[in-house]
């Protein structure tokens, strides 16, 4: 299960960083413009530790994504059958 947690954090990290770059927004400008501490953003993009849902939600909204859009990106990023229990 620990491995799945890591995969999830890494998927969130990749999506957040890619979407910010796709918008052409510099790291510091993104954080300052959306009142997101750089340490919080660092934790998310480096998949360093569990980040609160509030902080992830704040970043998702700052990226101008709906939660549905973010979920779709997450589904594409995660391996097939990601949460399926072993039989």
Regions found by a protein language model. Give the residues of each.
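DNA major-groove recognition helix of helix-turn-helix
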Residues: 20, 45, 55, 74
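Short alpha-helical DNA-recognition segment
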Residues: 23-43
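Residues within the helices of the helix-turn-helix
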Residues: 17, 28, 39, 57, ...
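A short, Lys/Arg-rich alpha-helix, primarily the initiator
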Residues: 1-23
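Short, basic-rich loop-to-helix N-cap that marks the start of a DNA-contacting helix
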Residues: 48-61
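The alpha-helix within a helix-turn-helix
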Residues: 20, 31, 60
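Short, charged recognition helix plus adjacent turn
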Residues: 1-3, 71-87
């Amino acid at each position: 299960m620990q491995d799945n947690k890591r995969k999830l954090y890494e998927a969130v990290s990749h999506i957040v960083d890619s979407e910010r770059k796709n918008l052409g927004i510099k790291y510091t400008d993104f954080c300052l413009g959306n009142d997101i501490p750089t340490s919080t953003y660092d934790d998310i993009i480096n998949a360093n530790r569990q980040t609160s849902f509030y902080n992830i939600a704040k970043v998702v909204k700052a990226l101008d994504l709906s939660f549905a859009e973010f979920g779709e990106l997450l589904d594409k990023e995660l391996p097939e059958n990601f949460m399926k229990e072993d039989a």
